[in-house]
Amino acid sequence: MNDFNKRTEKSKELTDYFVKFLNLNKISYYESGYEFYKDNHNATEKIKFLKDNTSEFIRYYPDFTIVGKDKSLLIETKNSSGIEKKCYNNYLSLVQNLNINVLLLLKNKKLCRLEDLKFSIVNKYDKIVEMNIPVTDKVWKEPRKMNDYEYKLYKKKYKEQGKYTSGCSFAFIDFENTKFYDLKTLLSLNN
């Protein structure tokens, strides 16, 4: 099983929990994230490596579209402690540029509005690999800004520790200072 499939499997727990909640509460939805797409000729595998805006928009599109009585919203499920920078920026663009409602469902099984999301201030030093990792804006770890040798060593050390990293730029979510909402707030969509 490749690393992407391992991550998808981990997120499946939260996704299954969410789908069960939606079904129990008769909330209309459909799975809109690209990992749910049916494809031919390995399209979903190929798109992961494309860097154009359209491909990245598709790759980072939120997992669920919730359809209420008077409005719809998008929800991304994240069963991890962090979020990739490109992913976050795509959601932020949907909110700021298109006035689209985007929520995150995080590993604590709570909802968060993008504008309420807070990030932890991070140190450059990564204890797992015992290396300094470039950091921007005090929150974004940027492993791909290392030179090629350091980056490969970084990935190798993570793997040796039985850990996974995509190597993408990411930030850790500050679960103490982020404002969360109970899943039951979605029930108001049907009123």
Where are these regions (language model features)?
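Non-catalytic C-terminal interaction segments of nucleic acid-processing enzymes
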Residues: N2, L24, F36-Y37, D52, ...
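Active-site-adjacent loop/helix micro-motif of nuclease/hydrolase catalytic cores
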Residues: S81-N89
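Conserved phosphate-donor
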Residues: L106
